[in-house]
Every structure is written in C-alpha cells, then in structure tokens.
C-alpha cells in the first residue's frame, strides 16, 4: 500500500518525536548545509548536534541583548518571540504582578507576541491593560500556586477564563505558563498559548520553556530590584525632605503641610496632587445649634469622619506639576471644585481607606470628569487617595494624587511611598499642636500679667467703704457673723427706691461709682439669691467692688456701662415680668453676666484687636473681646474671696457657668442677626396662647427657647442707653461717639489706616444721621419685639421712638445746613466764573430788572 505525500506530511506533523529521531539518523550535516544559505558549522556529525549549536547561538544572542539593552520589555520581547519559534506556540504573553488597594493582580505588559511581531504592537499601554485578579484565569492560578502549569485542554481546566478570548476574538486550546520568582515573591507570569505542531505542549517543551526563561527571569529580577531600589530611594528622599520642612515650620499646620508637599513634589511621580485640610471642630457653637433645635435648619446628615466630625474641607491646596508648575490655595472650596467633585476625598475622609483607582473615568463609584478639566487639556486617568492621620488617629486631611507620570496605574510601592509621607505629616501635627498649646499658654500668661498689673483686687481699706465693720463693730469683716454683716449692709445700702433700680428710665449720671456698687449689691438682695444660695456677704461686697475695678477707666465701656447693663437685666426680669420664665438660679447668673459682660474692655472693638495683632486675637478666634470678658469674669469667680457661686452644688455651678457663657458671648453684635428670626418666632409663638400662665409653663421648660430669649435680653441690655430719656440718651451717645473717635485716632496713627465714618472725628457732625441709621438697622427690632412679647417693656420702645425723632430732627437740620452751604458755594463758584469771562472780554450777564434802550 503506497502513501501519498500529504499523508506523510500529516504523519510527521502528528508525530514530532518520531520525526526528530528519524531525521537525526538519516540527515547528515552536509545535507542540512545544502538546504541552508549560511552553510553548516564545522564539527557537527548529526542533525541533533546541529540543533544544539543553533540553540547555543540563540542563547548567546540573548545574553548579548541583556548586556547591551537595559530595557526589560525589549529583552523579554525577544525571548518570547524566540520561544514562540522553538515551542511552535501561536503566541506568548507577559503578565506583571502588582498590588493595588492591598489586592494582588496580574496585568498584561507584552501581549500576543509571535515570531514576526514588532515590539510596539505587543507592548500594552496602561489604559489598555487586561487585568486578572489572582482568583481568575490560569495565570492567576499560576501566581497563586507559584508553579508551572501545562494545560493540555482548556475546556477541562477549572481555572481557565475566556475573558481575554472574548476581548480579543481568539480561541485558546492549550496553555503553558510559569511564574517568574524573586525569592518567594512573584514578579511576573509568562504564558505560551496554542501548540501549532501538536495537540498540546510536551514535557520537552516545558524543559525548553524553563531553559529560555532562566534568562528572562534574570532580566525581570534585575528590573524588579531596580524598581524597588528606585522606590526606596524616593521614599527616603521624601521622608528626609519632609522631616526637614516639618521641623523648619512648627507654628502652622497649613504652612507645614504646604512646605513638605511642595519640597517633595519631584519624588511623587505624578501629574497633580491635591491636599484637602479638614475642619477639626467636634462641637458646634451654641448659636449654630439653635437654628437646628428651632427647626429652622436641617440637622447635618452628610458623611462624618470615623471620630464623628462633620466632613468639611476648609482649605484645598492644588499642586499642578505638568506643563507650567502652579500652586493654587482655595480657602472654603466649593463642593464642585475639581478635586472634591468626584466625592473621593469625602469617601476617604469618611472611611479612612486608601483608594487606588486604575481607570478613573470608568469608575462607577465616584464621579470623575471624563473630559479635560481645564484649558491645558489635562484628563484624570488614575488616582491614589489616602487620609492624613495624626497621632490621635484623627483624620486631619486627605491627600489625592493623579496620573502617574509613566502612564501606568499607581501600584503597591506608590501606596507605600505616599502613605509614608502622609503618615509622617499626620504624626508631625503633634509638633504644631504642642506649639499651639505653648503659644496659647504664652498668650494667656501675657494677658494674665496685664490683668494683674492693671486690676487690683478689693483690699481691706476699700471694703470698709461699703462694709464699715471697723467703725460699727471694731473688727474686720472676716471676723463678723453673717447676721452682723447683713445688718450693716441694710443700713448702708441705698434701697431700691432711692435710685429707681426697678425703672427702665434709670440713669447713672447722678450716681457715684461707689453708689453703683452699692446698687449692684442691692439687686442681689432684691432677687432673693443672697440667702437662698448662701452667698457670703463679705464675698458679695468684694466681688462687686472688684468687678467695678475690673472695668478700665475709659470713655464709655467702663463700670457705669457694666452696671447699666446689669440694671436693665434686673429691670427686664422684675419690672418686665420676664423672670416668670427663669428660676432664681438663672436670674442670679443673668444679672452676674450683665455685670461682667464688658469687664476689662479696652475701648476698641474686635476688628481693632485683629488689626493690631493683639494677643487676645491670637487667643480667641471669634467674639474676641466677649470671650475675654467671659474669661476675666470666670477668673474673678475662681478666686475664693470673690466666688459668689462657692456654695452652689456641682450641677448648679455648671448651669450658671453655662448661662454666663451664652449671655456674655451673645453681646457680640455679629451674632445678633443670627438670633433675630429665632427670637421673633418665639414672640409669634407666644401669641398663640390665650393666657400667660400656660405660656409661662410651656416656655419655662423649653431650655433652648429660654436661652435664645436670654441672649436677646443681653442685646437689649447692652443697647439700653438708646432707650433712656432724651436728656440722658443724648449725653450717653456723645460718650459712645467719643470712644469710637478715640479708636479712629488709633487706627489713623498706629495702624496708618483711614477709619470708617462712625469712628472718624472729622465727621462728628454726621453723628445724628449715624444714630438714626443705628436705631433703624439694629435697635428698633429688639425693643419692638420685646414690647410685643411683654407689654410691660413698651416704655423702652416708646422712648426709642422718641429719641429717633430727636436724632432725625438734628440730622435734618444738619442736612439743611449742608445743602445751603453747598448752594452758596455753587453760587460763589458761578460768580467767579462769570467775572473771569468778563475780564477775558466776554459778554456781561443780562440784568433781570434793567434794560438799556
């Protein structure tokens, strides 16, 4: 039976082993040489020897490539291309091992390499990678087991995944794959696909595969170690320069972060990065809580940090490193700022996770912009974001890095480097915190020294002016019984009727400062708190006298003003019937707050403290003077000989201090407009009750509403000079204006700034107009609403209206004079102009009464 040529070809193709043995015996080197153009190497006696010589030459060529070319992809590409020829595989591929977000994966670096392929066609760009998690596909299985795998039929392999086949319209039949190891660590996986001259890869193919890959392994190891060395070098430089800048800048966390991030920008290997700093406030101020409690504002329902803070980026710093370098600092950034709009920084601040996103535009969880962000045409491709955590495990900010410079996604080494930087900076916050605390202590010390130098506590001689125990009893107050002291005070104090302390029209102009101290003591007796709360009477006298001395001798914000505010508070409670809502303890705290509300006032406002860089401005961020008055009042009360709260229990003491906090800070007019609408709603709410008793019962139990009313009472007391009889108000207004003018003089001379009209003594004639504006814009609402709230307070509103008429008349008179003066000046200017024209030969003006015929 004869065989056809085709049958012989098929037999030899299907039996490569037999063909190898047969041609090894039958073919001589001369026969092969005749078939080849290059001839035959000398000394070869068989075909097998000739194959070994060719293989040695190929391996030598690979070694030469490795010596001459440091490019890993190019060397491995040549190895894969030769492997395809030797193994008779359809194609080979290289998968690089990496980790992102703590999850290992394999990504295509060289894909579908064939004997005639070109490197540029097989090199996979970062945005076209095929990525396999280790639990998917044969390559993932190889990376997990770290062993070679020879899959003779992929349909019978449980690990096979057709994912890549579906993407490339290819059919995989068999696979030979092996891991590239560096010690115990996987560096890459190389895979050969589809044996062309047989049904599957053989054991001899496995030997050849491993033999060639020994060289590939060496090259990949060198590449991997070089990359790790580069990463560690960058990491060392980042930490070194960060430490340098951290210890160079200890005063301000923002400047510290900025200097460190800017200095290490060259080592971060990205196009852009953005640092968002978080608000560290854990508890809101009471005036921010009130709108929520009153139902006027929605409670915050957004994301929070792990320690419960609202996520609020108070500043974002953008570092742009591509093209022309630029740094942009955005205070109070809007929600649609490009670095925040995706929601990634907020998510990182909420979860504390490190997020490494390979393909940002395709990410479904975050909303990254797909097109260019700006005119530069820059597009977000891959993102690495991580929290900046301090030593207390609090997230103080979020650092987000965009687009690795080589186009590849950020990997585990990038995560380690960036995390080292953010962790170091987070821990370094301890330095700025410590410095900040030391700075505050230093400021407190300076302020305390100033207080000690200026204020002198009530001494033994001064107390005898009010409590003359030596004259009456021949002994010091400390040696007297409470009944003895009470008897003396009853004789010495003026009584409520003498100076009209129950009246809204009370005036201090006819009183001495000592008489005002006595009236202050009398108010505590009228409230009934001296006996009820066991206030030592010597302590009460010392406290009032010390408070009076605590006020500086300035034009308006002196002891007289402090007493007037307390007296108005007393009158609102007693005469205005507002005490029906408050307990005796609360009334006790409110009058005390009135006495202390402007203690140690400097005669200048909060803005001046900031402009002049006063230590107070460095100590208190907002309501600067009000917080200082509060601290000074507490300072006096902390002294045992002045502590009128000394016999209160712990709960009572906490309550009165809390009320003083609210009452004194509420005198900041900057907060007045925040509480107006809330107070108005309470007044409107009171009109829904038919009888006052039920309303009083309701409001007495509503803590938040009572605090809002109390805060507005403090404003009404602080502005009460505007409601005094005209003969009193006109004089007090001049005192207020004089103090403002003094501040204006300081601004002009010390700060070299032009003061506003209200504080410019050169515009003193405009005082009536300014008073009318102040009454309309600030005062009218307060007293109108209080007169609606309690009709007993109507006299204050009536006198306010009367005073407005008086000021308006003066303002109109001034305006008329100014207008007349302007008209006279205009006529004079016109006359001069006409005279000049006549002198220059021009026509004389016509007379309206005479005519020349």
UniProtKB/Swiss-Prot annotation:
Q: Which residues carry this modification: Cysteine methyl ester?
A: 850
- Chief localization: membrane
Q: Which UniProt keywords apply?
A: Acetylation, Cell projection, cGMP, Hydrolase, Lipoprotein, Membrane, Metal-binding, Methylation, Prenylation, Repeat, Sensory transduction, Vision
Q: Where is the lipid attached (S-geranylgeranyl cysteine)?
A: 850
What Gene3D superfamilies would the database entry show? 3'5'-cyclic nucleotide phosphodiesterase, catalytic domain, 3.30.450.40
Q: Tell me the cofactor note.
A: Binds 2 divalent metal cations per subunit. Site 1 may preferentially bind zinc ions, while site 2 has a preference for magnesium and/or manganese ions.
What this protein needs as a cofactor is: a divalent metal cation
Name this protein carries in UniProt: Rod cGMP-specific 3',5'-cyclic phosphodiesterase subunit beta
Q: What is this protein's gene name?
A: PDE6B
